[in-house]
Curated annotation (Swiss-Prot):
PANTHER family: ADENYLOSUCCINATE SYNTHETASE. GTP binds at residues 11-17, 39-41, 311, 337-339, 419-421. Homodimer. It comes from Saccharomyces cerevisiae (strain ATCC 204508 / S288c) (Baker's yeast). This is Adenylosuccinate synthetase. Mg(2+) binds at residues 12, 39. Its cofactor is Mg(2+). Keywords: Cytoplasm, GTP-binding, Ligase, Magnesium, Metal-binding, Nucleotide-binding, Purine biosynthesis.
């Protein structure tokens, strides 16, 4: 059994909390894409664990965790995150963590060129805006992967005669091509090389053939949960390109990032924030550049876990959610942070786009169009009630249930979980048929 948790908007929907809720039922949690450019916090017994690259399944002492071939790995950050989690009391994490031998490596010079590229792009753009990269080197690493010049985990840990020398030569060549492109930026190659010589020995025990790992688990009928990174609207193909990440963050990325066939997928859980946020630049049709946006930002504590950047806030965009549903095929939804809307008397939701008076049939691929659309809103009544202490779905205010029902009816997917507060137990389950 393979079930998948995916973000349906622009990220930061609260995927980690749902994964945390579910991991007790699973034998394996796997990540399939991205790197340490995303982040979420899980609270267990009053202890906060910040995850960026590593799977959230580490909070379950009986769960194995895999970084698949689609993930890009900055090895120093891998160990730093692991050590930070261990220092907070995470038990036997090292024996439960595995890394695909096919995953690509992120080097520090990828991070340097990430920022240089961002400056270059902002200088070229008409409005001076940049993509809003986290600066973690993710984009440049996927770029070297696509150009077939990147280095993978197996290149680093290979013990065969001459393998280390080949790694050094390829590493140096990769650095030189970056310097040819971006100038002679500061980078101590010899010091980094010495660091990686130590790290390769530390990394070896974690490395597995992830294809064999996954297929053996599937054959053994293990329960597997795939933890998606980022979200559909940041997908390299289906997101608001070019204001996207560099990987496939939808259901397609699950298959290619773990090497599993489509028929192995059972349930696909779409995580949806009860309003909409995004970090960085790019079109955002329902954004509220007013007191409503500020109120959502303040009550929702909308700051990025990885970057600390303030998130842009707006009303729930059902055009986005319907588009996301078409691509990912969600079998049920998790609506998060519903409590943030508690004090709003009226709650608009975006239900259609039009441009120059003409209604659009679907979410547009052209950002020149998307940036000019007018949003039609359906205004729903608020519930003006604190829902953070409610423990059963049935006890939610009627208007809160109507809000959720409107979402269900619009996208044609049932709501199965509802987040009503930051605590681990603040997640209501709704039976679905």
């Amino acid at each position: 059994m393979v079930n998948v948790v995916l973000g349906s908007q622009w990220g930061d929907e609260g995927k980690g909390k749902l994964v945390d809720l579910l991991v007790g039922k699973y034998d394996i949690v796997a990540r399939c894409a991205g790197g340490n450019n995303a982040g979420h916090t899980i609270v267990v017994d009053g202890v906060k664990y910040d995850f960026h690259m590593l799977p959230s399944g580490l909070v379950n002492p009986n769960c194995q965790n895999l970084l698949g071939n689609g993930v890009v790995i900055h090895v120093p950050s891998f160990f730093k995150e692991l050590e930070t989690l261990e220092a907070k009391g995470l038990k036997n994490a090292r024996s439960r963590l595995f890394v695909s031998s096919r995953a690509h490596l992120v080097f520090d010079f990828h991070q340097v060129t990430d920022k240089l590229r961002e400056l270059e792009l902002s200088g070229r753009s008409k409005d001076g805006k940049n993509i809003g990269t986290t600066g973690k080197g993710i984009g440049p690493t996927y770029s070297t992967k696509a150009s077939r010049s990147g280095l993978r985990v197996h290149h680093l840990v290979n013990d065969q005669p001459g393998a280390w020398e080949e790694f050094v030569a390829r590493y140096k060549r990769l650095l030189e091509t970056r310097r040819q492109r971006y100038g002679d930026f500061e980078y101590d190659f010899e010091a980094k090389l010495a660091e990686y010589k130590k790290l390769r020995e530390q990394l070896k025990p974690f490395v597995v053939d992830s294809v064999v790992f996954m297929h053996n688990a599937i054959e053994a009928k293990k329960k597997i949960l795939v933890e998606g990174a980022n979200a559909l609207m940041l997908d390299i193909d289906f997101g608001t390109y070019p204001y996207v990440t560099s990987s496939n963050t939808g259901i397609g990325g699950v298959l290619t990032g773990l090497g599993i066939p489509p028929r192995t997928i059972d349930e696909i859980y779409g995580v949806v924030k009860a309003y909409t946020t995004r970090v960085g630049e790019g079109p955002f049709p329902t954004e509220q550049l007013n007191e409503n946006g500020e109120k959502l930002q303040t009550i929702g504590a909308e700051f990025g876990v990885t970057t600390g950047r303030k998130r842009r806030c707006g009303w729930l965009d059902l055009v986005v959610l319907k588009y996301s549903t078409l691509i990912n095929g969600y079998t049920s939804l998790n609506i998060t942070k519903l409590d943030v809307l508690d004090t709003f008397k009226e709650i608009p939701v975006g239900i259609s786009y039009s441009i120059q008076g003409k209604k659009l049939d679907l979410f547009p691929e052209d950002l020149n169009i998307l940036g000019k659309v007018e949003v039609e809103y359906k205004v729903l009544p608020g519930w003006d009630q604190d829902i953070t202490k409610i423990t059963k779905y049935e006890d939610l205010p009627e208007n809160a249930k109507k809000y959720l029902k409107y979402i269900e009816d619009f996208v044609g997917v049932p709501v199965e979980w509802v987040g009503t507060g930051p605590a681990r137990e603040s997640m209501l389950h709704k039976e679905i048929k």
